[in-house]
Swiss-Prot record:
Single Gene Ontology BP annotation: protein folding
Molecular function (Gene Ontology), one example: protein-folding chaperone binding
Function per UniProt: Participates actively in the response to hyperosmotic and heat shock by preventing the aggregation of stress-denatured proteins, in association with DnaK and GrpE. It is the nucleotide exchange factor for DnaK and may function as a thermosensor. Unfolded proteins bind initially to DnaJ; upon interaction with the DnaJ-bound protein, DnaK hydrolyzes its bound ATP, resulting in the formation of a stable complex. GrpE releases ADP from DnaK; ATP binding to DnaK triggers the release of the substrate protein, thus completing the reaction cycle.
PROSITE patterns per UniProt: GRPE (PS01071)
HAMAP family documented for this protein: GrpE (MF_01151)
Chain segments carrying region Disordered: 1-30
Pfam family, one: GrpE
Family: Belongs to the GrpE family.
One GO CC term, this protein: cytoplasm
Known partners and oligomeric status: Homodimer.
Keyword Cytoplasm included in the entry's annotation: yes
CDD domains, per database record: GrpE (cd00446)
Protein name: Protein GrpE
């Protein structure tokens, strides 16, 4: 009987020795699984971020892609506006069709610019200077005005959607009191 018991004890001990390497292997596989899961989740997050970035870039390209063209058209707008401002009543009467053509061209240019999100910034004399939308071309003391008030508007400014395309050029009062 002693002989029967001895081999059984050895057999019992042998599985315990083989279980330890299996446990180590199981832990290794779990760690590898966790690492792969983490890498997979990071890859998913990167893909989602890339998709969002591409969507944002596409939207910005749609909104602001014509910025350079719009900026190049602003002198045309300015010149048409100036031509109408300086035309005297006699010139308007003598060249009514020409003046009407310039007015229609300017109106159409405004409509096209508006359609593409280009909007004028039209400060008025007496408004407060806003450095986000205005460019001070000069400062001068003017009686009856406060420092920082607009005293002259030289050119309109323009926004394209929510971005400044060109600041309005203005003269600003430098008075320290009212």
């Amino acid at each position: 009987m002693a002989e029967d018991q001895a081999p059984r004890e050895e057999t019992v001990e042998a599985p315990e020795l083989t279980e330890a390497p299996e446990i180590d292997e199981l832990e290794t596989l779990r760690a590898e699984r966790d690492e792969l899961r983490d890498r997979f989740m990071r890859a998913l997050a990167d893909a989602e971020n890339s998709r969002k970035r591409a969507d944002r870039d596409r939207r910005e390209a749609e909104q602001y892609g014509g910025t350079r063209l719009a900026r190049d058209l602003l002198p045309v707008y300015d010149n048409l506006s100036r031509a109408l401002e300086v035309a005297t009543d006699e010139q308007r009467a003598a060249a009514a069709a020409l003046i009407e053509g310039v007015e229609l061209t300017l109106r159409e240019l405004r409509n096209v610019m508006n359609k593409h999100g280009v909007r004028p910034i039209t400060p008025q004399v007496g408004d407060t200077f806003d450095p986000q939308q205005h460019q001070a071309m000069f400062e001068a003391p003017v009686p009856g005005t406060k420092a920082g008030q607009i005293i002259q508007v030289m050119t309109e400014g323009f926004m394209i959607h929510d971005r400044l395309l060109r600041p309005a050029q203005v003269g600003v009062s430098s008075n320290t009191g009212a």
